[in-house]
A protein has these predicted regions:
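N-terminal beta1-alpha1-beta2 submodule of the flavodoxin-like/Rossmannoid cofactor-binding fold
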Residues: 1-79, 83-102, 106, 160-184
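Short, glycine-/small-residue-rich phosphate/pyrophosphate-handling segment
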Residues: 105-152
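Beta-strand-loop-alpha "switch" segments that mediate conformational coupling across diverse proteins
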Residues: 153-158
Length: 184
């Protein structure tokens, strides 16, 4: 989860998502990215020399995230949309993954070691989704094509203003239906 606010709108939706995964007896690992040490990618390409895994030389929390992704079937990103894209910690994760998981950038072009996995996203934004999160969704679609991942969709819930209540039963139902669609 890539929200700086642990009780914010994205966090509330993520709690519903996790509850639904529990109800469906799906195993998952939850990360709050703002609590983690994740450096940005520097495009050094050292990870390209070894195709056996993620293999970034940086000694931070990204190695564990990458290992868990390699052991998973579905990758779920949850982020508020700030300035039409994900928050900085998720962008750092995405940049590190695109190099470490896609062995395309070395002396010899290698495989996408995470090919075939599904990727989906849950987002919140202060604009209608077609004007607030559409650019991020397009970015995820391209990211998935490039990485040989299956883009399984994105759900965006709109917050209509700071003086309004965000969460309601309709939003909770949307998240539950989204999770059920992913895991059927």
């Amino acid at each position: 989860m890539a929200s700086p606010r642990k009780e914010g709108n994205t966090a509330v939706l993520t709690k519903v998502l996790c509850s639904e995964l529990d109800r469906l007896n799906e195993e998952f690992t939850y990360y709050h990215l703002y609590d983690m040490n994740i450096d940005g990618c520097i495009a050094c390409r050292r990870c390209q020399q070894d195709w056996s895994g993620f293999n970034c030389f940086k000694n931070d929390d990204m190695q564990q995230i990458a290992e868990d992704i390699l052991d998973s079937d579905i990758i779920l990103f949850a982020t508020p949309i700030y300035s039409w894209y994900c928050t900085p910690p998720l962008k750092a994760v995405m940049d590190r993954l695109v190099y470490g998981m896609n062995k395309y950038y070395g002396e010899t072009k290698g495989p996408a070691i995470w090919a075939g996995k599904m990727l989906a996203a849950v987002t919140t934004c202060g604009y209608p989704p077609e004007k607030g999160s559409d650019i991020f969704e397009e970015g995820l679609e391209r990211y998935c094509r490039h990485s040989c991942l299956e883009f399984a969709g994105m759900i965006t819930e709109h917050h209509k203003g700071y003086n309004t209540v965000f969460m309601d039963s309709q939003k909770a139902e949307h998240i539950k239906e989204f999770v059920q669609k992913l895991y059927k």
